[in-house]
Amino acid sequence: MFDQIKQRLAQIFTPSRLFIYYNNASLEHTIASDSGAQIRDGIKSVGKQGDCPEAEWPYVIAKFKTRPPKSCYVDALKYKAVLYQRLTPALSQLKGCLASGYPFVFGFTVYESFESPQVARTGHHASLPKPDESSIGGHAVMCVGYDDAKQWFIIRNSWESKWGMKGYFTLPYAYVTSVNLASDIWTIRIVE
């Protein structure tokens, strides 16, 4: 959406997360299982076949095995990522990307504290994982801003708007720039 605003495209819409997820799983041959996805493949999918509006194929996770209707694929061709790039986890590059008006997506390792009631209520995840904390999986999100005073990134989650700060949360700079905690960082620059 941000790249559409930046490009001043006539129609601005929220991309369908489930359309991307299904087509990503198709690339990875994992449609039969809800096993997550690689961001790189999701970006490739949007580059190859585009994405339809969320309103057309809404995020209903129970439909993760269902192929979107043909109309979604026709509409998706109007919105293909034609210029995208991988980013390094260098703080200056990540902040520079955001300062230029481009959000970025990335994956991060989720630890138990991220799913705490406090993070769900406030959206603030202010610390790195503790040594005795267990990893419970990975998650893909979109970074939309940063706060130098607090040393954290502002991130959009794909979960409902009742979670965190109306669907947003924060992670410390040190979390997002750690190659042991975050990876697969991409930005889309042009959609056509």
Residue spans for each PLM region:
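Acidic helix-start/capping segments at beta-turn-to-alpha-helix junctions
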Residues: I12-E28
